[in-house]
Amino acid sequence: MTAFLAVVRRDLQLAMRQGSDAALVLIFYLLAVLLFPFGVGPEANILARISTGVLWVTALLAALLAIERLFVSEYEDGSLDQLALLPLPLSLVVLAKVLAHWLLTGLPLTLLAPFLAVALGMDEAGYPVLVLALALGTPTLSLIGALGAALTLGARRGGALLALLVLPLYIPALIFGVAAVDASLVGLAAVPHLAILGALLLAAIPLCPWATAAALRQAIE
């Protein structure tokens, strides 16, 4: 556990020193959401109707911005070999790095979402479910994105390949995240959709780090 937390702390400290990736994600999320009122027009009912999808799709795209470089710096300077030699399974090292990535990107996106929902005219009844759905969905996006980042590590045009690999895998989280919020807005139970989001996360936690670790070992060799 000490080694796991040390990896999390290391990644957080490095990100705090550099700062650009996390800030870029939040700025992109903010600007992308706020562009929709200009594109759709001043019709409040239209904005409110599409607000859930807008918030989820832009969060999904924002999460892609920083995930590409999750392993790049370690791969380029050779420290990825050192991480593989830690007294910790490589899958847990991956999980620690994904946790740090989520704390820097997914958590801020989740906390920012209700404020942007106000700008889109979403009914306040949907705010709690929106936050809960993103809190369950964004870690899944980070875990899947980490697998894509490992598979495209060192590849030419890795960013485009990463998007092609992971965007289809993001669809289940997107569907049930949007469905949960929409259900709460019309007075239906959001619990079944949230339960599926939770199940997706529980499945991704053991599977994605294991597969990502295998891809990283292949990249190291």
Task: Report the location of each language-model feature.
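Hydrophobic alpha-helical transmembrane segments that constitute the membrane-spanning cores
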Residues: 95-120, 140, 144, 177-178
